[in-house]
Amino acid sequence: MYEIEKTERVKELIAVTKSDSGISGPELCAAHMELGRILADGLRELDPDDTTVVAMLRGGIFFAEGIYFALRCRFETFDPKRQEFVRPGTKNVIIVDSVINTGKTIEDILDLDMYVACCVINENAVAKCKDRLYTVRVSKNSFVGAGVKKQAAGRGPDTTMRLFNQI
């Protein structure tokens, strides 16, 4: 597992992305994009001509764009609710999502030679990705994303809804 170094700037960005930050919309998207660019430093050894970033829709789009801009590779999107996953033809494939709670969606499409990148992953899902995981941080917290503004009773603000300014 690769976890980015927590510089002061990274800590500021993490504070913006946390569910209890109260921040939504473009400011949150910009934080995801910048964190994606920073995380991409750990993936620099990959040949951009033979690498595809696959953004999990909708929540992974901005984090994936940051990685894409930094690596200058290929880019695709995947909607697990509406599509069957088709592995891109490049040697290197990076599946990108903003939040991984259980890891089930990723586990269903992950091959042994693919990478996973995320802003945050629940500690219980880390083992599903093993040494293929690139993350900003690992969290002990896990809750169901919902259209609420505050965390309570196992539910919290849905990251995708926050990214698109819908709560």
Language-model segment annotations:
Residues 1-167:
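PRPP-associated nucleotide enzymes
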